[in-house]
Amino acid sequence: MDALNGKIPTICLVDDDASVLKATSRLLASSGWKVESFLDPIAFLRYAEASKPRVAVLDVIMPIMNGLEVQTELQTVSPSTRVVILTSKDDPAVRSKAMAAGATGFFLKPVDDDEFLAGIEAAANGTKSS
């Protein structure tokens, strides 16, 4: 992990499935990342506006707002936050739209741990992974 100025970057997880949040949070934390998890995308956007996290991992299919809508709003409230998509549905149109809007990675659930961690590292360092 590449820390910025000795500070561990925050990775935010946004997913409406608590079990996915728990497992993904555990994976990231065990690799040394600081993790904040959100079931509610609105609460996440409020947090992001105030805290400017380095990376946001967004599910696509969620109630209230889908991941692409969250990504669009995030560009307004925290434009420096990099987005990684983590979804259960491999939809080429969604992948294309997310990447065109600036996502640095797109991963399918269940995720390959090593590939996902490499994608988070790339996002935190400002590069694209997939």
Question: Where do the model's predicted regions map?
Answer:
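Receiver (REC) domain active-site loop signature in two-component systems and cognate sites
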Residues: 62
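A Lys-centered signature of the CheY-like receiver
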Residues: 109
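Alpha4 helix (beta4-alpha4-beta5 surface) of REC/receiver domains from two-component response regulators
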Residues: 69, 90-105
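Acidic catalytic/metal-coordinating carboxylates
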Residues: 39-40, 66-70
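Non-catalytic signal-transmission and effector/linker regions of two-component phosphorelay proteins
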Residues: 1-12, 18-25, 114-130
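Short hydrophobic/Thr-rich beta-strand motif most characteristic of the beta2 strand and flanking loop
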Residues: 32-39, 47
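Active-site beta3 strand of CheY-like receiver
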Residues: 51-57
